[in-house]
Amino acid sequence: MRKPFYKILYVQVLFAIFVGILLGHFWPDTGVAMKPLGDGFIKLIKMIIGPIIFCTVVTGIAGMSDMKKVGRVGGKALLYFEIVSTFALLIGLGAAHLLKPGVGFNIDPATLDTKAIEQYVSKAHGQSTVEFLMHIIPDTIFSAFSNGDILQILLVSLFFGAALAAIGERARIVVQLIEQVSKVFFHIVHVITKVAPIGAFGAMAFTIGKYGLGSLVPLLKLIGTFYFTAIVFVVFVLGAIARATGFNILRFISYIKEELLIVLGTSSSEAALPHLMEKLEKLGCSKSVVGLVVPTGYSFNLDGTNIYMTMAVIFIAQATGIELTLLQQLTILGVAMLTSKGASGVTGAGFITLAATLAVVPTIPVAGMVLILGIDRFMSECRALTNIIGNGVATVVVSAWEHELDRAQLKRTLQQGGEDEAELADAGQNV
């Protein structure tokens, strides 16, 4: 028996987003006051991300008898990330040149007030490649979890899982315990997901109430160019990769629609991380590959952020009348490939990464970021959506490369569409 449509999670989230837009538009002060609802939901999800990554990675690695396999999976994932990220950067650059969203502004950078972007620039100046790599190593095992840093948690999990695998059968009881604890944490995720509509409502009401739909009008061409380019990237680039791997990108998007709507409402791809990992396992990807690829992808495979970065840089150059040479554009690409690795799945990280890129390329004034500050929140939804789709596709691809993908289950699950989602939602209700 099918559930009434109003009890389906993605319908509830869609309705909540719509109501949030109305509230923020007509009663902006009330909309801004709804911010704690969105923040609270994201904090609930972040509370559980660390333990879930730890349990998933540890049990996955502990189940691998060959530690070379861990390195092989990680190496293939990083290779995939670099290739696809480069495509994303190039597509963002090409689209900005082709559609010219910044031409016609004729803005003098000296007239721009940079006070609003000082917090982003100061954070960006603190980032460097060496510091980023050193930051991956936590001060203590516990600080990785208390800080909620995904890469630090992943590093701790890799060491812990490798140690359990080395000990072998004597550590079997520990592995079994972690497997059971993992089930508890995923059950908590199902409970938290029930309030996703409230979180999406609060976050969207705040966004519209604070920034207003009117702030979109002057920069509609840039927003339209970015959204159009992201759609082209997902449909054609990720679509071609998916087709080569043996699945349809549109069916895959339909399969993770609940996660996408949560991301749309909260502007944070981290909000859907636990559910995405569970969905990918149900899709036929091995637990070990999911545990390694998804968390790593949240810092190394941000396709939406990459498209945004090169497009935003060219937009600022066009708006301020700066002509960039081929060498300067290649420099921007190289710098962006490094700075994008410092971005995480949280709101605002893409803007900080853009500041880091501009700081290394003095030809383009950092003050130009003021032009897109007001609309960055509206663009962050598209960044986060593209990022999560890209990470999902990457996990399926690496699983296929490792022969760790149950293709029959993949085909069956995608063909069934929403049936598995209904079962997942029912499981969450039986608490």
Curated annotation (Swiss-Prot):
Record SUPFAM superfamilies: Proton glutamate symport protein
Cell compartment(s), UniProt: Cell inner membrane
Protein name as annotated: C4-dicarboxylate transport protein
Disulfide bonds: none
GO molecular function terms listed in the Swiss-Prot or TrEMBL record: fumarate transmembrane transporter activity; malate:proton symporter activity; succinate transmembrane transporter activity
Keyword annotations from UniProtKB, A to Z: Cell inner membrane, Cell membrane, Membrane, Symport, Transmembrane, Transmembrane helix, Transport
Nucleotide-binding keyword on record: no
Transmembrane segments: 8-28, 44-64, 78-98, 148-168, 188-208, 222-242, 307-327, 355-375
Family, as annotated: Belongs to the dicarboxylate/amino acid:cation symporter (DAACS) (TC 2.A.23) family.
Task of the protein: Responsible for the transport of dicarboxylates such as succinate, fumarate, and malate from the periplasm across the membrane.
UniProt KW Membrane keyword: yes
Lineage of the organism: Bacteria, Pseudomonadati, Pseudomonadota, Betaproteobacteria, Burkholderiales
GO cellular component, one term: plasma membrane
GO biological process: L-aspartate transmembrane transport
Gene3D superfamilies registered for this protein in UniProt: Sodium:dicarboxylate symporter
Protein's membrane topology: Multi-pass membrane protein
